[in-house]
Amino acid sequence: MAVQALREELDSKCLQLLSDLEELEAKRAALNARVEEGWLSLAKARYAMGAKSVGPLQYASRMEPQVCVRASEAQDGPQTFRVIKADAQTPEEVGPSEASLRRRKGPTKTKELGSAVVPQDPLNWFGILVPHSLRQAQASFRDGLQLAADIASLQTRINWGQSQLRGLQKKLKELDPGPA
């Protein structure tokens, strides 16, 4: 009876793995489409604004990331990747930065605790009125970044599923030395 349950679990893991592989193929195709669309929109913007108006000379001297990729690992599962805004605070960072007494009446000019620099939209590097194709390129690359994080999570889930599948096959071979 244990062999039959093990075979059923092996079948379900195999079906899950095939489903994940199919999803991975679809997401990779979507990522390729987003990146291709982004480069095409960027080329259209360069044509509309001129080659010298859209290039490395317009980049900010100090670039700040707008998003970060955060990896989180479950205790009993594979690692997952999420795209989050760079200025979003984690729960550990929320709250007062230091405990102190407040003065009710005192100097009116106080040091601001939350004076963090808000990341500027990179489209503003190229002027105030940018072509729509440049905005489309930014949106395509942003969507591509989310898809890349999804693909990385899916790939780790597939690798984790493959290792589980190998473990189940090994168990089955130990319990039932006949044809598997």
Curated annotation (Swiss-Prot):
Entry GO terms, CC: COPI-coated vesicle; endoplasmic reticulum; endoplasmic reticulum-Golgi intermediate compartment; endosome; lysosome; vacuolar proton-transporting V-type ATPase complex
Assigned keywords, A-Z: Coiled coil, Cytoplasmic vesicle, Endoplasmic reticulum, Endosome, Lysosome
Protein induction: Modestly up-regulated by FGF2.
Entry superkingdom: Eukaryota
Pfam families referenced in this protein's UniProt entry, alphabetically: Vma22_CCDC115
Annotated tissue distribution: Predominantly expressed in the heart, liver, kidney and testis and at lower levels in the brain and lung. Undetectable in the spleen and muscles.
Spans annotated as Disordered: 90-113
Coiled-coil blocks: 4-38
GO BP term, example: vacuolar proton-transporting V-type ATPase complex assembly
InterPro entries in alphabetical order: Vma22/CCDC115 (IPR040357)
Location of this chain's protein in the cell: Endosome; Lysosome; Endoplasmic reticulum-Golgi intermediate compartment; Cytoplasmic vesicle, COPI-coated vesicle
Major subcellular location class: other
PANTHER family: COILED-COIL DOMAIN-CONTAINING PROTEIN 115
Function, as annotated: Accessory component of the proton-transporting vacuolar (V)-ATPase protein pump involved in intracellular iron homeostasis. In aerobic conditions, required for intracellular iron homeostasis, thus triggering the activity of Fe(2+) prolyl hydroxylase (PHD) enzymes, and leading to HIF1A hydroxylation and subsequent proteasomal degradation. Necessary for endolysosomal acidification and lysosomal degradation. May be involved in Golgi homeostasis.
Quaternary structure and interacting proteins, as annotated: Accessory component of the multisubunit proton-transporting vacuolar (V)-ATPase protein pump.
Protein name: Vacuolar ATPase assembly protein VMA22
Organism field: Mus musculus (Mouse)
Organism ancestry: Eukaryota, Metazoa, Chordata, Craniata, Vertebrata
